[in-house]
Amino acid sequence: MFDRQAKALSPSFYFGAFAVLTVIGFLAPIRVGDLPGYDDARYTVVAKQIVLSGDWLNTQYNGAPDFEHPPLLEWIQAAFFSVFGISDFVAKVPSALLGWGTVLLVAWLARRLTGDPIQGVLAMFALASSAYFVKYTARAMTDVPVTFFFLAALCAWSLTEDSAGWYLAAGAFTAMALMTRGLIGFALPAIFGLDLIVARRRPRWGYALAALAVAILPLALWYWRLIDHYGQVFFTAHEAWLDREAFGTLSPSWRRYTGLFEYMFMLAKSYWPWLPFAIAGIVTIIRGRQRRLFVLLIWFVVVLAMCAAAKSRVLRYMLPAYPALSILSAIGLAALIPVRFIQRGLLFATPVLAVAVLAIAIFPPVTYHVPEIRPIASAATAATTSGERVAFYDQGAPLYDEVNQMLWYGGREILFLLSPGELEQALQARQIDVFVVDDATYQTRFKSRIAHEVIAGAGHLVCVRLSL
């Protein structure tokens, strides 16, 4: 064990050091760069509209109701925008802070489950050094927030052994996960139920049923309101989204049965250097038959199964299982390596990590996604008045990332044109004066053919205003 007389070698010292380093490492780099378009800018567009309109219930995207996800992330972002202003940095702050909270909570849960503060520190270090997790703490997306609420629900669940009141807390955090990401939140009741069976625990049924109601009611009320307001319009739009993302047919059809192998392959490629230790942790728990720790295996398997069953397969959907993998890695590391070597490793790793974090904080990596969008969006906004729309056409390709960035960095709704026929129809209707098009389309369809004024050009895009 660590020398209790040497505060610098105690688990509490490392917990504090890693807590400080991770909050710096997560917050400092996001002050630079912009927002990727497809997901990040889409969520923030909804949050920006909440602030501008003052309407927190009727969430809007590009002038239409937003039916994709429940709105908890957008509500959080809108709250930050209301206090700190609308900017790229503020849009990313909620994910960074909740990512930091996830690192802190995983240390607590690992210590509670194993009874070993060293393993709490190791789990914290494993999660904070998982490149894929760290990447998404800098993104204005739902993945890290839902991971935090997922972990918080499981922390509360672990405390139900001590007090039945924690059932309600577990239900509340489950509700937050459901209101952030929808489908993946349903993994939590499954995990709780399987843990009761495997651990042979008798639930307090009154509290358990109340917790289930607390978990489901906010989501049910949200969708009931959408159905009541929009009726068949909601069903049609949401069914199309579910078909596209979750339950639709795959091509080729045999891919319906390959999700498990695809995710295992993605983890095998990316979860380094912790993968061998996570496997060792799984083996240690199974061999030791420690029922208290089986919840980690249930957690990982249930999230994996739900992700594998869906149509859309991206490794970030597995992030709610990363805290479980981190604790498994800590258990495996403690089982394979003598504690004195772990102590020396932490003593060496902490200053190295501190130098790396400070270097990143001072010289953050800067990434700009489609940098030509910002000047084009600003020019299109300046050339129009409130209530006018801007037509957007980029070779007829479904470039929703560019449209989302136009909405985020500009101040006008977009008419997204997806075919040459739609472009011709918009030009002939003359209901929109400002068009943003790709340079090739400008050369063949606008230049020398249509009376217009070039407002701005950047990269492969040209912004024009039609002349009367």
Predicted feature locations:
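Extracytosolic helix-loop segments that constitute the early lumenal/periplasmic catalytic or substrate-binding loops
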Residues: 24-27, 42-65, 71-75, 79, ...
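Transmembrane-helix motifs of polytopic, lipid-linked glycan transferases
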Residues: 93-114
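Short acidic/glycine- and proline-prone juxtamembrane loop motifs at membrane-interface regions
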Residues: 95, 135-145
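Membrane-interface transmembrane helices that cradle and orient dolichyl/undecaprenyl
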Residues: 112, 117, 153-169, 177, ...
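Hydrophobic/aromatic-rich transmembrane helices and adjacent perimembrane loops
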Residues: 137, 311-338
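Transmembrane-lumen/periplasm boundary regions of multi-pass, lipid-linked membrane glycan transferases
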Residues: 176, 185-289, 304-311
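Short periplasmic/luminal acceptor-recognition loop of GT-C membrane glycosyltransferases, typified by
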Residues: 189, 360-444, 450-466
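Signature aromatic-anchored transmembrane alpha helix within multi-pass, membrane-resident enzymes
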Residues: 289, 333-361
